[in-house]
């Protein structure tokens, strides 16, 4: 393992200004308040060789293209770095205790019988068959489950791997079920060892009239004691990026076929940057979504410039140098986690037009109770609006430096 000074790693050529997207927040202008044991800390673990698919042969999920040992080490290192602990066991203990302390449950750790739901991003899976399209990595998911059980002391039957709106593919189910047969799997289809997702209606009522946006939430999400948001590192034609905040959409009672779903309040005004209510702020601030999350994780072992299809292309700029991103980003702070992922994507593909104003949801969430839109964010519509920033957001400068956000880069 090798820790490198970020400025040395990212000695990059200056990009042409016109190629840069228009954003609401300038570099090194932090907004909000950091969350976590170490407020605003983000772990970036980079392990070249964890993903090696050639982009053409068969499916990227096959074992010959992925290194499980590296994935295991990455997840354990990410958890240790976020918690500031010397072992994965100590890290999980610290994370559970910090969560419970900040949620009014006392200074205690994980207790047997408490359930932990891991929300995957299987947006490109509508059957249980493996696909060439990019979804949650079977290797990162197994690594996360292994660490929770073997390091965190969580019982198998208390771990729920879920994707309420899509299908959990065979490569994920088979790999985990073979090793941990009591882990529960819940997806949109059910069958083949998976439990079909059920929903509680009218759980998220939104802070404004949000049209036909889904308002039900998966029972496995609502009933869990803790959540882990395991997202992907991808661009998106609508909101610009799809990271941990967008991943919550899949916890609502949307249709398996995405064209049948509403997407109100998700995308920014890409042409003029006119401020507008952002649905993702309600998801981050909801008591049974972002506010119940123990850990935010972005799986960037492949990473992609495309929301659909196979992962592509390989990453060209340093430190990737024509390889896959081979990275995991993790934090207790939902805004800090997403802004680091966003900065990585923007740095690699600055010409992507949908990046314009993609940071609006982060600005809104970081400036509660006085966001630029003037919206009073009250996700449950219970008359108890959010009264404080939901985290810390700050864009890096050209040398990948932050001033308040603490980014720790670890190369393995």
Language-model segment annotations:
Residues 1-4:
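Positively charged n-region of N-terminal signal peptides that target proteins for export
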Residues 6-7, 123:
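General helical structural elements
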Residues 20-112, 123-131, 135-412:
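Extended, low-polarity segments enriched in aliphatic/aromatic residues
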Residues 15-19:
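Sec/Tat signal peptide C-region and signal peptidase I cleavage site
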Residues 7-14:
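Bacterial N-terminal signal peptides
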